[in-house]
Swiss-Prot record:
<protein>
    <recommendedName>
        <fullName>Nicking endonuclease</fullName>
        <ecNumber>3.1.21.-</ecNumber>
    </recommendedName>
</protein>
<keyword id="KW-0426">Late protein</keyword>
<keyword id="KW-0540">Nuclease</keyword>
<keyword id="KW-0255">Endonuclease</keyword>
<keyword id="KW-0238">DNA-binding</keyword>
<feature type="region of interest" description="Disordered">
    <location>
        <begin position="126"/>
        <end position="145"/>
    </location>
</feature>
<dbReference type="GO" id="GO:0003677">
    <property type="term" value="F:DNA binding"/>
</dbReference>
<comment type="function">
    <text>Endonuclease responsible for the single-chain interruptions (nicks) located at specific positions in the minus strand of the viral genome.</text>
</comment>
<keyword id="KW-0378">Hydrolase</keyword>
<dbReference type="GO" id="GO:0004519">
    <property type="term" value="F:endonuclease activity"/>
</dbReference>
Length: 145
């Protein structure tokens, strides 16, 4: 059982390593504008995409040769998620994002992550504006009074 886990990690590393040359980081953090300690964040977690791909095609990703022989098909299928649907963040904001959405955010959370990045940016750009909290909910005719 432990061997499978090891190979699963290796499959993820093999897939990641092959696509890294296609990454393009911006020159500053999308939230704070810092140009130091920049990291690329994938809104669609690579390890989750790899697991999904292997499951859909019923591939045994404990076999390195199978991983390597399917790498280009994986890149082609998920090029948008791997290369384009990403954001450059400073290390601080990248860590904050992962505190909110966990180390391996589920694939369905991509749009929520994008909204979170925008919200953090808005907070920095407009520190005086506070999020309005609805304190009272009226129902029936009371809404019109």
């Amino acid at each position: 059982m432990a061997t499978n886990t090891k190979y699963k990690r290796d499959a993820i590393s093999i897939m990641r390593d092959g696509i890294k040359s296609r990454y393009s980081k911006d020159g500053c953090c999308a939230i704070c504008g810092s140009s130091e300690d920049l990291e690329l964040h994938h809104y669609h977690t690579i390890s989750q995409l790899i697991k999904k791909f292997a499951k859909e095609l019923q591939l045994d990703f404990t076999d390195e040769n199978i991983v390597l022989s399917n790498r280009e098909a994986f890149y082609k299928k998920y090029e948008h998620e791997l290369v384009r649907d990403v954001v450059t963040l400073c290390q601080h904001h990248h860590q904050l994002l992962h505190k909110v959405y966990t180390k391996e955010p589920p694939l369905f959370s991509a749009n929520k992550q994008k909204a979170w990045v925008q919200k953090q940016k808005d907070k920095i750009q407009n520190p005086q504006e506070k999020t309005q909290v609805k304190t009272e909910t009226k129902s029936g005719f009371a809404r019109f009074l």
